[in-house]
Design a protein with these regions (language model features):
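ATP-grasp fold ATP-binding core
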Residues: 108-112, 134-152, 175-185
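Conserved N-proximal alpha/beta basic substrate-recognition cap immediately N-terminal to
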Residues: 9-120
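Extreme N-terminal starter segment of soluble prokaryotic enzymes
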Residues: 1-5
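ATP-dependent carboxylate activation and anion-phosphoryl transfer catalytic cores
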Residues: 229-295
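Phosphate-binding site of ATP-dependent enzymes
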Residues: 152-242
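Rossmann-like NAD(P)H-binding beta-loop-alpha module
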Residues: 114-138
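Short acidic-glycine loop/turn motifs at beta-strand connectors
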Residues: 26, 194-198, 255-257
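Short glycine-rich anion-binding loops that position phosphate/pyrophosphate groups of nucleotides
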Residues: 66-68, 147-148, 268
Length: 295
């Protein structure tokens, strides 16, 4: 029986959905917390283990959302995944793609380098520089944490005095300032789930009343949709730009330019709402992408 380990930050819906899919595929499924990772060097042939399972002896490793932690635990966890990957064990997503996509600045820069349209964005450490960029971006911006997802920590700033206070507060606590032009959109965005170089499911996310955000986690309403060829191509190319085999790609229709833009790419995407509205068994597809279809 094929065996995989899923590194998780809790045993919620996604873990149970993966367990169900694993049973249907005849896979021995081991979900373990990221904090259970153990690394060994020069230690009786051991390398990386989690809850007593050697990660260099399984058929695949699936990484889910990493829990918040300090710099040292995060670096160690990524080091351990790199070591497992270099041992030839399939990991979804590969560690480098996670490192790229979790960083909004780096991932957006690589997406732009791939020739894809992105929102004008400033990143820096100086509140004065950020305030200058605020004016250059039209005086209506979204301030985002450099790391983060699901619409959490986002602030829309549309007047100079508020911008100054927000930027100075972030500067005082040592945050990097990530300031993005607010895109005027029709009240919804698109989420494309890219797996193995193709879009396997997609949806529109309609924002809740009086909220410019569309994330389902904060009340957005999902609706199944078939993407047009342009949006589908953009989603696939954005995932490729950040080296992700699996990605949730967020796109917006820019009403001012008349063209869609890539907002961001998530290399650890959820699929609870997406699988519900599309009736696609995404968990099964994810496991098949990791270690191949049932044989």
């Amino acid at each position: 029986m094929r065996r995989i380990v899923a590194l998780v930050s809790g045993f919620g819906w996604h873990v149970e959905d993966l367990r169900r899919a694993a049973e249907s595929l005849g896979i021995d499924f081991h979900p373990v917390e990221f904090s259970a990772l153990r690394g060994y060097v020069g230690h009786l042939g051991k390398t990386v283990e989690a809850s007593g399972v050697s990660l260099t002896e399984v058929d695949g490793v699936l990484g889910r959302m990493m829990p918040p932690a300090g710099l040292e635990p995060v670096v160690f966890r990524m080091d351990a995944l790199h070591r497992v990957h270099r041992a030839g064990i399939p990991i979804l997503n590969p560690p480098r793609s996670v490192e790229i996509s979790v960083d909004k600045y780096l991932s957006l820069a690589l997406i732009e380098r791939a020739g894809l349209p992105v929102p004008p964005t400033f990143t820096g450490e100086s509140s004065a520089d950020a305030l200058e960029a605020f004016e250059q971006l039209g005086g209506d911006t979204i301030v985002k944490p450099l790391f983060g997802s699901e619409g959490r920590g986002l602030v829309r700033v549309s007047d100079r005095e508020t911008a100054r206070r927000v930027f100075q507060a972030l500067e005082r606590i040592g945050s990097v300032l990530y300031v993005q032009k607010a895109i005027r959109h029709p009240g919804f965005d698109y989420r494309a789930f890219v797996l193995g170089g193709r879009v396997v499911a997609s949806m529109k996310r309609h924002g809740p009343p009086a909220d410019w955000r569309t994330n389902v986690a904060i009340g957005g309403r999902p609706e199944a949709v078939t993407l047009d060829p342009l949006l589908e191509r953009m989603a696939v190319e954005a995932a490729r730009a950040v080296e992700a085999e699996m990605a949730g790609v967020d796109l917006l229709d820019d009403l001012d330019t008349g063209r869609p833009v890539i907002i961001e790419v998530n290399a650890v995407p959820g699929w609870k709402a997406l699988s519900k509205v599309t009736n696609v068994d995404i968990a099964k597809l994810v496991l098949e992408q990791l270690i191949g279809p049932q044989r």
